[in-house]
Amino acid sequence: MKKTRINFIWLIGLLAVFLTTTGFVQSNIEDNAHILNKETKTLINEKNNRYLQTKEQPQIVVITVKKLNKLTPKTLDHSKRTVFIVGGQKGSKRNVQFFSTKDLHGAFTADARANILRAEVDQLRSQNNAKFNQGLRFVFRACATKVDQQYQYALDKYDLTSSEQNKISHPHSVALPIALALAFLIMGIVYVLKKFGHRNSEPHN
């Protein structure tokens, strides 16, 4: 009995050493809601495989769950150099949020996270799975770009293009010209109406 107990303790110790030395890296994908397509999974795995070749070995994990709220991953506080993108689905509704570990908070400020999600909000809420995956890939690539910039990695084909980064950096850049055009149009209509009303109010001979 004593020998069996010693062997059990020895095995537990060996397992602990193994998990410590190997880093016990979490799986890149946990598709519990079964909504990720092949293209999305390929992107996630290929980019993370590149990260394995770096000194820091950051990771971007994508998780899907069958709920819309309380999406914070349980392993967030125990992880390092990791971004978690969580897609929730319940019925026809979908919700996407992402979280970063403390060592990446500088790259993922509240404004940065909001701008990334806002840029693809229609796709991320779409009931069309192809469009949803398109939006999710954009979020993943945006996160990858932030991580690469944080660790000064060379940008690659998995990162956002300059125009896509612009879309996030200046979320109101497209809306502003439209708003100005509408303002001028309204001013023009008001001017015409006032002029027309003034003419009608003039006495006729």
Locate predicted features:
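Generic N-terminal leader/processing signal
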Residues: 1, 45-47, 193
